[in-house]
Amino acid sequence: MPVFQAKTFRRATTASSSLGERIGAAYRGGLPKHPFLLFGLPFIMVIVAGSFVLTPAAALRYERYDRKVKQLSQEEAMELGLKGPDGEEGIRRNPRRRILGDEREEYYRLMAKDLDNWEQKRVQRFKGEPDGKL
């Protein structure tokens, strides 16, 4: 039986192997020896660089929002009907709009309702929809 060599086979770095293959082989060979230097450090650098790139984008987003929502002057508020000439009291409000008072007032208003006398009513179902009756 023939005897095989103990050395592992390594491809010769000839002109036929591309630069990318040679760099990849060197990277894979060095990765077990220096994992933080070849994997951890580039990862951390990408995260930090991404943070610096995204900071102006976030600032632009909030500046755009601030341009939309700005504080109105007294004259602009009067033009929009948000304030009357004598302040908040001169505003005509929708009478159907319910403005809640304090919690105590709301509590007593709810307690005054008669919650014991009620009747369950069935909701009308669509055609073909099961109504839950057996």
From Swiss-Prot:
Transmembrane segments: 35-55
Transit peptide range per the UniProt entry: 1-23
Any Pfam family matching the protein: COX16
Disulfide bonds: none
Keyword Membrane set for record: yes
Protein origin, superkingdom: Eukaryota
Keywords: Membrane, Mitochondrion, Mitochondrion inner membrane, Transit peptide, Transmembrane, Transmembrane helix
Gene Ontology CC terms: mitochondrial inner membrane
Mode of membrane association: Single-pass membrane protein
Known function: Required for the assembly of the mitochondrial respiratory chain complex IV (CIV), also known as cytochrome c oxidase. May participate in merging the COX1 and COX2 assembly lines.
Protein name: Cytochrome c oxidase assembly protein cox16, mitochondrial
Gene symbol of the encoding locus: cox16
